[in-house]
Amino acid sequence: MLLAFDVGNTNIVCGIYRGKELLNHWRLATDTLQTADGYASVLGTLFRINGLQFSDIEDVIISTVVPPIIPILESLSRRYFSVNPI
């Protein structure tokens, strides 16, 4: 599965895809002061509610207009999904 982050100034839209099919999506607040662990905590809850596990994620892509969030989401991807994001 693919986890896509579309980061805007106000919100991060996260989508989970299996092939071309969008399985789930969520909207989180964009916060450059949030840590990778903080985002992982929120995503972990959303994953569990929807019957997903971090180990289901095989690829991560980050699209952003907020450059300071890139290292945070890169760290999240590496630490929790064991994936180097695109």
Regions found by a protein language model. Give the residues of each.
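Short glycine-rich, Thr/Ser-proximal phosphate-binding strand/loop in the N-terminal lobe
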Residues: L2-T45
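Short beta-strand-loop/turn "lid" adjacent to the catalytic site in phosphate-handling enzymes
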Residues: N50-I86
